[in-house]
Structures are given as structure tokens and as C-alpha cells.
């Protein structure tokens, strides 16, 4: 990934347009994980990315890391949601994203508690959102408050700000281990250019957290 002179714009293979815009991020994660000892056959994206759930039979994740030891025992190391949101519809789709991701996190943690993943230690859960940078996503949005006031941080917050708040809160509430928010306009997205609107939601801490966890867990599995 290459930093631009502006400091906030960064290059990546992901684009905000196109049906498979997140494939570049999955490829990047696979490549980086290979440097800490995770082989391609231990990464699951388009094929076999399913995990058992507690409230539902299975959930299809966007990116999984499952390591197998010498005895054939499997360990879940990481599960990642790689999402994008392109306009023009932001309001309802944002709410759907929030509900979906919270449900997935709740489901997997209870499944973990109930030993669905056998001897696995707590997995690393990640959430990455690539949001279209456009007037509709960055302008203030009015909220309906017919009975009670919304929390202050949501007043006049744009959809981009709402995503920022969401990504921050899911880590604060320990639903996900780490989260990342990126923004890109349609032209920049085609060139692999994105912005990082919040310092605590940048991609490098997200990647560092993932790689550190996976490398540590893989080493423990190999030595057991």
C-alpha cells in the first residue's frame, strides 16, 4: 500500500465500485498472512467460508483463517467481514449493515462459548467497511425523534460519521476485536485510492492486530 502526499489518501487494490470490489482486500490479507506462516489452504473466502452458529445453523463469513495441526485438529484463528457500501441508498442499507454485523458477532461468540469450534481459543473478529465518499454519504442527516431524543453523537451526523461511530462502538463493546473504516469516491476507487476518516479506524492497526493474533495462535498450535 502506498501513501499519497496528502497523508490521508492511501493506495490499495480495493475499489468502491464493481461487484467484487473487496476481492483485493481478501487477496491482501491472504498475502500478509502467508508471511506469518499461514498457507493459502488455511484461508477461506469464496469456498468453504462457513462456520456453525448458535441462533442459526451456519454463517458465511467473508474471510476465515482455520489452522490444522499435525493431528488433524482444526482451530479457528480469525473471522473477518469485508463490506462495501455504495450509494445512492445509504439510510436503510446502513441500518441493515449494523443489524447484520451485530447479529453475526453475537452468534459467533455464543457459538464459541458453546464449543462449536472445539479446542479453539477466542478467535480474532474483524470488520472492514469501504464506504463511497460522495455528497450523499458525507452531508448531515436529520434524525426522527418522535418520542425520545437520540444520543447526541447521532444528531446531524452524516452516514459516514454514523459508520465511524458504529465501527468504533463494536470494538468498544467487544463485539469485534478490531474494525476499519475506509472511504473512496468512484473515480478514486477505480485507481485503488482511499481515505481514512478516523485515526483509530485506520487499516494499519487493523492489519497489525490481525497478524499479531494469528501469528501468536499459530505458534501455540504448532508447539502443542
From Swiss-Prot:
InterPro entries: Restrct_endonuc_II_XhoI. One of its GO terms (biological process) is DNA restriction-modification system. Keywords: Endonuclease, Hydrolase, Nuclease, Restriction system. Pfam families: XhoI. It catalyses: Endonucleolytic cleavage of DNA to give specific double-stranded fragments with terminal 5'-phosphates. One of its GO terms (molecular function) is type II site-specific deoxyribonuclease activity. It is an enzyme of class 3 (hydrolase). Its EC number is 3.1.21.4. Belongs to the XhoI type II restriction endonuclease family. This is Type II restriction enzyme BstVI. It comes from Geobacillus stearothermophilus.
Amino acid at each position: 500500500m502506498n501513501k499519497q502526499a496528502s497523508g490521508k489518501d492511501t493506495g490499495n487494490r480495493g475499489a468502491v465500485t464493481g461487484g467484487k470490489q473487496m476481492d483485493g482486500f481478501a487477496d491482501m490479507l491472504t498475502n500478509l498472512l502467508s508471511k506469518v506462516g499461514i498457507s493459502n489452504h488455511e484461508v477461506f473466502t469464496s469456498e468453504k467460508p462457513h462456520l456453525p452458529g448458535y441462533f442459526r445453523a451456519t454463517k458465511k463469513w467473508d474471510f476465515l483463517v482455520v489452522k490444522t495441526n499435525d493431528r488433524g485438529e482444526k482451530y479457528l484463528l480469525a473471522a473477518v467481514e469485508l463490506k462495501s457500501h455504495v450509494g445512492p441508498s445509504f439510510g436503510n442499507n446502513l441500518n441493515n449493515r449494523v443489524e447484520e454485523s451485530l447479529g453475526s458477532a453475537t452468534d459467533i461468540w455464543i457459538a464459541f462459548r458453546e464449543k462449536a469450534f472445539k479446542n479453539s481459543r477466542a478467535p480474532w473478529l474483524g470488520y472492514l467497511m469501504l464506504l463511497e465518499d460522495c455528497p450523499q454519504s458525507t452531508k448531515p442527516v436529520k434524525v426522527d425523534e418522535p418520542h425520545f431524543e437520540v444520543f447526541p453523537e447521532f444528531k446531524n451526523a452524516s452516514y459516514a460519521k454514523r459508520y465511524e461511530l458504529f465501527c468504533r462502538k463494536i470494538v468498544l463493546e467487544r463485539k469485534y476485536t478490531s474494525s476499519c473504516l475506509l472511504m473512496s469516491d468512484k473515480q478514486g476507487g477505480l485507481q485503488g485510492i482511499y481515505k481514512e476518516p478516523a485515526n483509530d479506524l485506520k487499516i494499519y492497526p487493523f492489519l497489525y492486530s490481525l497478524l499479531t493474533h494469528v501469528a501468536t495462535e499459530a505458534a501455540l498450535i504448532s508447539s502443542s
